[in-house]
């Protein structure tokens, strides 16, 4: 794993009035800054039935890793998270149904993102009324998808880069289109010629395959437990909504549809509603 920081601690669990059992909790992250993914690992001397981590107003599910004594969770620090001290509340139950609770501190530091200035078709900066209605409808549809946290975990093992090209635009960049400030870049752009195969970074289920106003031909893959991959600006689809896909399966082709200045792949990751950098995910669970 490519983490740059790791925090470990012990807390006491006292189920059902029995003697306390030690639980080791470790947190790993490339950094504790906006857009980063934090890996939470729990080792218990007593088997647990369920566990979740609540922080930043979101509830992140944890899952047993190999057995009920080892649990893992992924926490997202959203792009707009302010610097400060936050508490991760761990809660769940053991196999006897007794509650398990604890908390741990995360200290989030500030991050400065660069700015990109682009000249694009005016219809993407000031959409006509008909397009505005379409944009609103599409935004609502995508929000409903990202709000769902499925109980099934499709993904397993390390994540893979979906295309071989280098990064050409980083996550979090502040965007200025035709001289007007717009929302920050919530994904990572990879260079690629039109027609380059786009592969699923991990297993999942296709929950959207449609043409959207801004991101053009778009695919969303539900990897489970609130994690989604969003691929934009494709030239073609190789899957349909409802399809279950395997890691490295071709799901589409690089294109230049929607709001673009040239062909590339836009890859966004959502984790229980938080906007995180795909490269942060790869640093923890990448290959």
How would you label these PLM feature ranges?
Residues 65-68, 107-111, 234-237, 281-284:
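A short, sequence-level motif marking secondary-structure junctions
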Residues 82, 112-115, 276:
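Short, charged/polar, Gly/Pro-enriched secondary-structure boundary elements
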Residues 44-46, 77-79, 108-112, 173, ...:
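Non-catalytic surface loops within mature trypsin-like serine protease
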Residues 19-105, 110:
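Cationic-aromatic interfacial patches
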Residues 26-27, 100-215:
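Surface-exposed, glycine-biased beta-strand/turn segments
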Residues 2-14:
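Bacterial N-terminal signal peptides
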Residues 160-287:
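Catalytic cores of peptidoglycan-degrading enzymes
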């Amino acid at each position: 794993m490519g983490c740059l920081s790791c925090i470990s601690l012990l807390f006491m669990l006292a189920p059902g009035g029995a003697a306390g059992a030690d639980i080791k909790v470790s947190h790993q992250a490339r950094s504790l800054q906006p857009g980063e993914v934090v890996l939470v690992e729990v080792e218990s001397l007593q088997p647990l039935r369920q566990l979740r981590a609540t922080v930043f107003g979101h509830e992140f599910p944890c899952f047993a890793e190999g057995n009920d004594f080892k649990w893992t969770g992924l926490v997202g620090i959203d792009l707009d998270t302010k610097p400060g001290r936050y508490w991760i509340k761990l809660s769940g139950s053991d196999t006897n149904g007794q509650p398990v609770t604890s908390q741990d501190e995360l200290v989030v530091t500030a991050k400065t993102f660069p700015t990109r200035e682009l000249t694009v078709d005016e219809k993407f900066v000031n959409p006509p009324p008909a397009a505005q209605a379409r944009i609103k409808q599409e935004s609502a549809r995508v929000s409903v998808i990202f709000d769902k946290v499925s109980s099934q975990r499709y993904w397993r093992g390390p994540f893979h880069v979906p295309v071989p090209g280098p990064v050409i635009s980083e996550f979090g960049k502040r965007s200025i289109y035709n001289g007007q400030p717009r929302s920050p870049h919530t994904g990572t752009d990879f260079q690629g010629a039109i027609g380059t195969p786009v592969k699923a970074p991990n297993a999942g289920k296709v929950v959207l395959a449609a043409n959207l106003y801004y991101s053009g031909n778009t695919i969303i893959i539900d990897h489970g437990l609130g994690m989604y991959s969003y691929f934009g600006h494709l030239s073609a689809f190789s899957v349909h909504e409802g399809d279950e896909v395997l890691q490295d399966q071709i799901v589409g082709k690089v294109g230049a549809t929607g709001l673009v200045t040239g062909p590339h792949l836009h890859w966004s990751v959502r984790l229980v509603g938080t906007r995180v950098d795909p490269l942060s995910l790869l640093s923890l669970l990448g290959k």
